[in-house]
Structures are given as C-alpha cells and as structure tokens.
Amino acid sequence: IRDCLLSRGLGDVYKRQEIEAQGDVVAGKEILLIPTLNYSSMNAEKKKWISDDSDINRSFPGNIEGTATSRIAATLMDRVKDYTYGIQFASFYLQGISIPHVRMMETGTESTSLANLFGMPYVLTGDTRSFDTATLNYNWQKMGTQAFSVYSATTDTLDGESAKMAVSAVLRFLTRMGIIRYESHGGYISTTLKEKDLVSVRADEAGFFRCIVGVNQEVKRGQVLAEIINPMDGNIKAEVLAPTDGIVFFVQNSPLVFQNVVIYKIVRRMHQ
C-alpha cells in the first residue's frame, strides 16, 4: 500500500521526518510527501502561478507539452499514479473560517466509509461540476486512487489548534489503514453531508461586517448572526438572520463584505 500526501505546510514535513526517524512506517508501505507544487508563488504570497495567475488545481490531468501549470500537473499525475491513497491539504474556496472537515467528490468511486476513518467532525461530498474535472482530487479518483481533501479551519492565517487537528486526522487515517504505527486518539464520529445541503446565507447589503455568531456555534431560525455597518456613518445597515436551525459551518472573516456574497454556511439541524 502506498500513500501520497500533498501538503500546504512544513508541519507535515516535520511530522513525516519524525515518523521515518523512529521507524514507524510499516514494512512494505511507502509514503510520498510533497510540501508544495508552487514554491515561487508561495514566496511572493500568491496562491496562483505568479507569471500568468493560472491555477495549477485547474490544470489536471495536465499536458507535458502545455503551459507551465499544465506541465506541472502532468508531471505530478505521472509521479503519483500508482498510489493507493491520496491526501491533499486543500484551501476552502471561500475566504473565512470553517469547521475542519474532509471532502470527496462524487465520481462514482468515492468511499465515505474510508473518509470517516480520518475522525474529523464532518465528511463533505460534492457533485462534480464541469470545472471540477480539471482538479487534482477528481483526476486522482479517476486514476483509481482513493483521494481525499483535508481542510483545516483557515488558510490565510496561522491557527495552530486547527492545523494540529488536520495533521492528527491524517496520522489517524494512516494508522487505521496499517501504513504507520502511531498512537492517536479516536477522533470524532464523522457526520456525512452533501455540500449542496449546506444552507448559504448572503449579505443583503455591502459594508463593514460585524460577526456576532462564530463557526461551530448552534443557531436558531431568526437569530441575529451578524450586522452590516454603514462605513460612512457607523449605523447598522442590515442584520444577518439565520434562515434555519443548525450549526454554523462557515463564516467569512473579511472586515468588508459586498452585497450578495456568501457570508455564512449552516448545517441544517437534521433531528429534533
């Protein structure tokens, strides 16, 4: 059994080095860890390819004769094609804070039972949209690899506790699959959700965003989640109300919001 980790942080590199040094990788197993595919952009504090703003994660399966990002994608696909499991530390597509979770695309080959072994609070599955066919996760699954995207709470800020939860989830999965020897607690009994079942809350007005209810908090229908403040006079332009009972899955964390953008996502309460 071989496992590939595509990481967004050095903490994962250090942890792998520690595991290898202690001889905790089970005989006959192999772990490949790739810290990043885009060093130059990372050094310039950019997410996309620095020269043309193209997205590597919209370039798969890639073309070895194509553009820079397409060549990188093709090289990666060739390097990881024989691995049984693939884990990507991904960034949430909206700016903000979310409950840590693991996500799989619905390609017909996904296994939520395997995703539950990470022991994260939620397993999120999503329909495959047209642009998803050019992502790493989708193409990994199509190659026969069980591919997972692991999300910590934030991407653009340091959150030690959230990052520790994500790394622990991966170590837990590798332990349960018999790839490493590692003592870890059992984690969460994961709740499996479809991405389309998350209730989106949009801003009715533009202005300063004053968050009242944060992520992972329980809310009641009609409860005030946030206020949007007029930047000219400081008065409240609008109150953001919860459309349903549930738990806040995501909240945006920008001080300014535009009208009609998603500012909250709520897990609808399933049982009374």
Each model region followed by its residue ranges:
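Generic structural motif
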Residues: 179-227, 231-264
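Single conserved hydrophobic/aromatic residue that forms the stacking wall/gate
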Residues: 1-14
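A short glycine-/small-residue-rich loop at the edge of a beta-strand within enzyme catalytic domains
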Residues: 127, 154-165, 200, 204, ...
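Active-site/substrate-binding loop(s) of hydrolase catalytic cores
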Residues: 12-135, 139-153, 158
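His/Asp/Glu-rich mid-to-C-terminal helical/loop segments that flank catalytic regions of hydrolases
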Residues: 164-182
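Conserved active-site and cofactor/substrate-binding residues in soluble primary-metabolism enzymes
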Residues: 51, 67, 71-74, 110, ...
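Long, positively charged, glycine-interspersed low-complexity recognition regions
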Residues: 268-272
